[in-house]
Amino acid sequence: MSHPSPQAKPSNPSNPRVFFDVDIGGERVGRIVLELFADIVPKTAENFRALCTGEKGIGHTTGKPLHFKGCPFHRIIKKFMIQGGDFSNQNGTGGESIYGEKFEDENFHYKHDREGLLSMANAGRNTNGSQFFITTVPTPHLDGKHVVFGQVIKGIGVARILENVEVKGEKPAKLCVIAECGELKEGDDGGIFPKDGSGDSHPDFPEDADIDLKDVDKILLITEDLKNIGNTFFKSQNWEMAIKKYAEVLRYVDSSKAVIETADRAKLQPIALSCVLNIGACKLKMSNWQGAIDSCLEALELDPSNTKALYRRAQGWQGLKEYDQALADLKKAQGIAPEDKAIQAELLKVKQKIKAQKDKEKAVYAKMFA
């Protein structure tokens, strides 16, 4: 008979803790920290722990290192699970346990009754190897068929980012990989706090912070601190780090908005809008024109008459040589702020570009029919 999964994190302080540092498309997203239920399924837990450390050397059946480092999440299904652990073929057809190719189902003590449970992938009864999955919703149809052997205790936000990556079928469009992995020792903080020298003392993901997300005043203090760190990076022209900090602000805002009353959400809008606009400005500096346009659209969803968003989106359109789109945004901005000198100057510049483009086209046609 299966039992409800433990609610405490960790469920047993003596259980081993392991970690994955996850990269998506070559960029570090964050860390997932997992508790392994060695008190309930010791053989299954030991298999996974050793695959995280790589201490067992080369596998007998695969001829590959028994190690998750460099292993992709090869299968992702939204509102279901994220799957990885095929370190040999990297597509779901391979892998190997530390005990040999396969080992038996140890027990089905825990149910798949919530998000963030770690369970063994298999090809039927008693076919456990190295492949695993992390649930992103309750999956009761897997009870009695797959062995639950751990849980996410930190980094569920990283798992959610993985869950929501673009996929082709069930395969991520960008490579989602376990860049680093290992075992955490007693006293380790789990590595969830930024180590980027920025002075950021807040976990990257609000789910890992020991705060009440309903405390809007506390959230405002945290997000203002993070925004200021982002601004410092912006001033030093470190656009990527600035974006990272502004995005962290938005994660805290979104997590708080999800649990607070509607009336309180308005208090968080100004800082959210400011950071979305700043992300757009960073992307313009990086010549990421489409990214800047997308950020400005997000800002306009928060404030449809925001002239900064219209102005910056017009700059993005110009980067793509979509001058008519730029002209439309600037005319709308001018209608809202007719005295704004910067908008007037940009409008003149775009009109000149449109004229130059038309003159060039006329010259081409003239040569064609000469």
From Swiss-Prot:
Purpose: PPIase that catalyzes the cis-trans isomerization of proline imidic peptide bonds in oligopeptides and may therefore assist protein folding. Proposed to act as a co-chaperone in HSP90 complexes such as in unligated steroid receptors heterocomplexes. Different co-chaperones seem to compete for association with HSP90 thus establishing distinct HSP90-co-chaperone-receptor complexes with the potential to exert tissue-specific receptor activity control. May have a preference for estrogen receptor complexes and is not found in glucocorticoid receptor complexes.
EC number: 5.2.1.8
Family matches, as InterPro entries: Cyclophilin-like_dom_sf (IPR029000), Cyclophilin-type_PPIase_CS (IPR020892), Cyclophilin-type_PPIase_dom (IPR002130), TPR-like_helical_dom_sf (IPR011990), TPR_rpt (IPR019734)
Record-listed Phosphoserine modification sites: S5, S198
Activity modulation notes: Less sensitive to inhibition by cyclosporin A than is CYP-18.
Alphabetical keyword list: Acetylation, Apoptosis, Chaperone, Cytoplasm, Host-virus interaction, Isomerase, Nucleus, Phosphoprotein, Protein transport, Repeat, Rotamase, TPR repeat, Transport
Subcellular location(s) of the protein: Cytoplasm; Nucleus, Nucleolus; Nucleus, Nucleoplasm
GO molecular function, one term: peptidyl-prolyl cis-trans isomerase activity
Effect ascribed to mutating K308A: Abolishes interaction with HSP90AB1 and impairs interaction with HSPA8
Protein name: Peptidyl-prolyl cis-trans isomerase D
PROSITE patterns reported for this sequence: CSA_PPIASE_1, CSA_PPIASE_2, TPR, TPR_REGION
Main location as per UniProt: cytoplasm
Residue ranges of the region described as Interaction with HSP90AB1: 214-370
Similarity annotation: Belongs to the cyclophilin-type PPIase family. PPIase D subfamily.
Catalytic reactions on record: [protein]-peptidylproline (omega=180) = [protein]-peptidylproline (omega=0)
Assembly and oligomerization: Identified in ESR1 or NR3C1/GCR steroid receptor-chaperone complexes. Found in HSP90 chaperone complexes with kinase clients LCK or EIF2AK1. Two monomers associate with one HSP90 homodimer. Interacts with HSP90AA1. Interacts with HSP90AB1; PPID and FKBP4 compete for binding to HSP90AB1 and the interaction is mutually exclusive with the PPID:HSPA8 interaction. Interacts with HSPA8; PPID and STIP1 but not FKBP4 compete for binding to HSPA8 and the interaction is mutually exclusive with the PPID:HSP90AB1 interaction.
Reported tissue expression: Widely expressed.
Effect of N278A: Abolishes interaction with HSP90AB1
Region (Chaperone activity): 185-215
PTM-bearing positions, type N6-acetyllysine: K171
GO annotation, cellular component aspect: cilium; cytoplasm; cytosol; nucleolus; nucleoplasm; nucleus
Origin superkingdom: Eukaryota
Species of provenance: Homo sapiens
